[in-house]
Amino acid sequence: MEENRDVKNEELEKEEIADEVAEKDNETQESNDAAETNEASKEASENIEAAEEDQEDLVKNQEEENKKLREELDATKDRLLRLTAEYDNYRKRTAKEKEGIYSDAYVDVLKEIVPILDNLERAVAADGSIEDLKKGIEMTIKGCKDSFAKLGVEEIDATGEFDPNLHNAVMHIEDEELGKNVVAEVFQKGYKKDDKIIRHTMVKVAN
């Protein structure tokens, strides 16, 4: 009887020990789980903080880049405004200079024409014979040609082959002696200055 009681006591002690071991294992597991959870939470928190720092750096860099772009845009606008103003001043200045050149050219031409007008007025006002009048006109023509020479105006050559760039054909004739496309007669003289045609020579052309 007493022996059975001892056996039961031993079994109870073993069960208690097993329960204690199991409880300790559970506590250890819970402690490990808690540690792992804390570690994971800590790592997640660190990752969040790092992501927030990266986001802040990105925003800061973007703001700096935007500021730099705005400054460059403002500088470009300023340069554009200055260039526009400079071009406008240049355009006005060149227009004024061009107007001055034209005005000077007109004056130079008129200086040569006025003496011709003087000669014509004197010829009309003079009391003389037809010969005197003719002589006065001839002098006026000479003065006109001299003025043309000073202005660089030349008479267009109308001899030889017809040139549509220089001549204006107002009549055509058949003349085997002259040959084809040759100026047969000049009706009105033409003039040029350098490569500019003042007036084409009016001619008759042989076909």
Curated annotation (Swiss-Prot):
The lineage of its organism: Bacteria, Bacillati, Bacillota, Clostridia, Eubacteriales. It is found in: Cytoplasm. The keyword Cytoplasm applies. Participates actively in the response to hyperosmotic and heat shock by preventing the aggregation of stress-denatured proteins, in association with DnaK and GrpE. It is the nucleotide exchange factor for DnaK and may function as a thermosensor. Unfolded proteins bind initially to DnaJ; upon interaction with the DnaJ-bound protein, DnaK hydrolyzes its bound ATP, resulting in the formation of a stable complex. GrpE releases ADP from DnaK; ATP binding to DnaK triggers the release of the substrate protein, thus completing the reaction cycle. PANTHER family: GRPE PROTEIN, GRPE PROTEIN HOMOLOG, MITOCHONDRIAL. Gene3D superfamilies: 3.90.20.20, Head domain of nucleotide exchange factor GrpE (2.30.22.10). This is Protein GrpE. GO terms for molecular function: adenyl-nucleotide exchange factor activity; protein homodimerization activity; protein-folding chaperone binding; unfolded protein binding. GO terms for biological process: protein folding. Keywords: Chaperone, Cytoplasm, Stress response. SUPFAM superfamilies: Coiled-coil domain of nucleotide exchange factor GrpE, Head domain of nucleotide exchange factor GrpE. Its main location: cytoplasm.
